[in-house]
Amino acid sequence: KLNNVKLKIWQEPWLDFMLCWMIFDAYLTEISNSGIDKKKLMYFYQNRNDFKDRILAKWSSLSGYAARLKELSPIYDMRPGSIETTQIDDENNLEEVFNFVYQIRCNLFHGAKNVKSARDAELVSRGAKFLRTAIDHWMKGE
C-alpha cells in the first residue's frame, strides 16, 4: 500500500515538488545549522557538501532539466508588493538554477500558484523533475 501512495505522489507534480523540496530543505538545515532559507542556500553554494559534489559530478544528466526550466525564465516573486524576478541565464550555473527552483518553491508554498495555470503547472512539474533527479543522484551516491 505504501508503494502505491509513493507512486501517486510522484505522479502529482504539485505534491512531488513539495516533497522533494522538503527533503532538500531538511538536508540544507542539517548542513548549515540554520533555519533561514536564504542562509541555508548560501551555505550550500559556498561550502563543499556531498549533495553538491554528487550533482555537479552528474550535472550532464541534470542540465536538460535546467535548460527546460530556463525556457520558462524569468519567474516573478508573487508576494504582494514585490516586483522581483528570478531567471536562469546559464543552465549550467548551479546557483542560478537552485535560486530559480527556490522561487518556484516560494510562490508555491506561499499560495501564489494557480493549479489552472498551464505555465504554473509546467514550472512546478519541471522543478519537481529537476529536484527529484538531483535527490536521486545524491541518495544513490552516484
Q: What residue ranges belong to the model's regions?
A:
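Short, solvent-exposed secondary-structure capping/transition elements
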Residues: L28-K39, S117-A118
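Amphipathic, well-ordered alpha-helical segments in soluble domains
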Residues: K1, L19, V101-I104
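Charged alpha-helical initiation segments
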Residues: K1-W14
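Amphipathic, Lys/Arg-enriched alpha-helical patches that create a basic surface
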Residues: N92-N107, R119-E142
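Short, hydrophobic/amphipathic alpha-helical patches that form generic packing surfaces
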Residues: M18-T29
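Short, conserved micro-motifs enriched in small and acidic residues
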Residues: W14, M18, A121
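Histidine-centered active-site/metal-ligand motif
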Residues: H110-G111
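Flexible secondary-structure boundary motifs
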Residues: G35-E95, Q103
